[in-house]
């Protein structure tokens, strides 16, 4: 689900933190991609002309394989070095969100049985799409044969992507979920795995610019995300995005906000009973991840014969197209070795204290500018 309204806040308050990019601008960059999110996109978007998912001769869905093969090939062809990160065990706090998703699926299934118009049927069928374990297993097999590295995260994939980016193993984390920013990735790439047909630019979000522009520390950004609504707990009823940002700036932390509301700050706002915001905060600030220093990412020569056997003989893809793709893959992986000049210099991420100081400085500058405007009017 991500975090409701965070992208809108950044667009309105700090538009300069979101840069539209073309894929070629990431030549030589290593990028950690949220695999589960990508597979979900492929299962939704990669379809035949009649809207039905691609399938092999025995009727098994192959949309996830086509999406994974060709979108990865496109990235490599542009000089990117993609690696995929798969979800591990979800945190206990996420159980309520997963239960809600299951309930929504049941409601959709019931409604689907009552529909008669084909367009409505197709729309609701897409809402039932779910990434199964066999989709994941086949995607891993495909990546292994392509020579593309992947990481099995112990917990949330976005958190592991952010960990790899923080430690300099990759340039950025790629996901559609805005909660990736709360795990402190230096950069978040959105729309990276979208199809070319959608003509959506890649959005590169600079986390440090977001913090400076909003005048928040990393901890306060996490508290804002929890207030807006995340996968780990409910939000405060009656508090929208604008109010949430205002409260964080005025009171500094969720502890102070809860105290303010509980003491009668606003009768319309209601803090959920036994609200586990502290536990949710800990999941963002101390997530369950593999230490990036111990993770090895290697891009290897594709295994052509095994790849053709799997994709063509077993799954029914066109052999000439797969062979052509393998040649592009081989060429792209060799070309990516050239790399970028700035990849030879490891950028040391700022400490929590440095980020907090930057946020205070930005906030002070903003207040000074506002005072200057008032004096000019006088």
Curated annotation (Swiss-Prot):
DNA binds at residues 47, 71, 156, 229, 231. The gene is FEN1. It comes from Eremothecium gossypii (strain ATCC 10895 / CBS 109.51 / FGSC 9923 / NRRL Y-1056). Residues 1-105 are annotated as: N-domain. This is Flap endonuclease 1. Its EC number is 3.1.-.-. Mg(2+) 1 binds at residues 34, 87, 156, 158. Keywords: DNA damage, DNA repair, DNA replication, Endonuclease, Exonuclease, Hydrolase, Magnesium, Metal-binding, Mitochondrion, Nuclease, Nucleus, Phosphoprotein. Gene3D superfamilies: 5' to 3' exonuclease, C-terminal subdomain (1.10.150.20), 5'-nuclease (3.40.50.1010). Structure-specific nuclease with 5'-flap endonuclease and 5'-3' exonuclease activities involved in DNA replication and repair. During DNA replication, cleaves the 5'-overhanging flap structure that is generated by displacement synthesis when DNA polymerase encounters the 5'-end of a downstream Okazaki fragment. It enters the flap from the 5'-end and then tracks to cleave the flap base, leaving a nick for ligation. Also involved in the long patch base excision repair (LP-BER) pathway, by cleaving within the apurinic/apyrimidinic (AP) site-terminated flap. GO terms for cellular component: cytoplasm; cytosol; mitochondrion; nucleolus; nucleoplasm; nucleus.
